[in-house]
């Protein structure tokens, strides 16, 4: 969408005349903030050029193999706690990413890119995921699945926003939709457990064909501090300093139970690697899944939460 373009159901001047005046209503900036415009460019010509570039990354249909592009290796190395865009940049080909919906659901990064010259979709998570962030990820994965574009999900998050307000705004519905979207998608899916992948957010985002646990990540059904408060309650209560005892137990629990190696041992991940070898592992995983074709049962569709 061009910066000077307008998009609305109700003309801003009509709405304002009725007392419903909203700043920037109908503008490209408002469309981007609402998650309607995927990209905003300065001019119509630049917007058309960007649209052509994105279409060029996509195959003609879900059965056509992707185009192969020239590429350069990235120079960055994946680090736990990195901003989503930087985490993605460490995995995809250098300068190949085209971010979509940057102004909407900002704790999730979604982009088309290439890995080893092959088109992929990338979802990378930030600290906390609100209902808009989750909706953004769901929609992007559905788009990738429609064209059988492989999806790489980089998971490093505190989880869904712990907020009753966000729940009422649609947090629970969107989380259910996210889990259903990943489960329903038949395209190749690779999950990189780069940092924290705890509780329901792991269940939703790590529904992949191959899950790569990066050394130093935390994979757990429950936040370690909460887990030890239950498992070692009597021992912690008997200590002189409950906070210090809880922290010590949580650190030990994280190292012994929530490690990358233990995630592989218990089936929560398929392989482990260090940060320097994440891209190589992703390239190998995509090569392994390049011939994936999933057969569907002859039925209409599932009952996804919409």
Predicted regions: what they are:
Residues 1-306:
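Ligand-binding clefts of soluble mixed alpha/beta catalytic domains
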């Amino acid at each position: 969408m061009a910066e000077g373009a307008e998009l609305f159901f109700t003309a801003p001047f009509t709405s304002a005349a009725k007392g419903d005046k909203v700043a920037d209503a109908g503008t490209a900036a408002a469309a981007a903030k609402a998650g309607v415009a995927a990209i905003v460019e300065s001019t119509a010509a630049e917007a058309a050029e960007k649209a052509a570039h994105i279409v060029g990354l996509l195959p003609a249909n879900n059965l056509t193999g992707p185009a192969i592009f020239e590429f350069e290796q990235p120079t960055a190395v994946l680090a736990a706690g990195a901003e989503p865009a930087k985490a993605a940049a460490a995995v995809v080909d250098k300068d190949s990413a085209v971010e979509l919906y940057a102004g909407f659901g900002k704790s999730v990064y979604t982009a088309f890119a290439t890995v080893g010259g092959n088109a992929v979709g990338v979802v990378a998570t930030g600290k906390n995921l609100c209902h808009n962030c989750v909706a953004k990820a769901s929609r992007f994965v559905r788009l990738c699945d429609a064209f059988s574009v492989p999806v790489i999900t980089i998971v490093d998050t505190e989880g869904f926003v712990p907020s009753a307000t966000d729940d009422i705004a649609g947090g629970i519905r969107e989380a259910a939709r996210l889990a259903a979207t990943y489960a329903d998608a038949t395209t190749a899916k690779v999950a990189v457990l780069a940092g924290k992948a705890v509780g329901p957010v792991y269940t939703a985002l790590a529904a992949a064909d191959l899950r790569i646990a990066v050394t130093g990540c935390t994979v757990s059904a429950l936040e370690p501090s909460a887990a030890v408060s239950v498992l070692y309650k009597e021992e912690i209560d008997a200590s002189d300093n409950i906070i210090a005892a809880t922290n010590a137990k949580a650190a030990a629990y994280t190292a012994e139970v929530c490690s990358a190696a233990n995630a592989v041992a218990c089936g929560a991940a398929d392989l482990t690697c260090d940060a320097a070898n994440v891209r190589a592992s992703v390239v190998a995983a995509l090569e392994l899944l390049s011939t994936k074709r999933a057969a569907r049962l002859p039925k209409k569709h599932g009952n996804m939460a919409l």
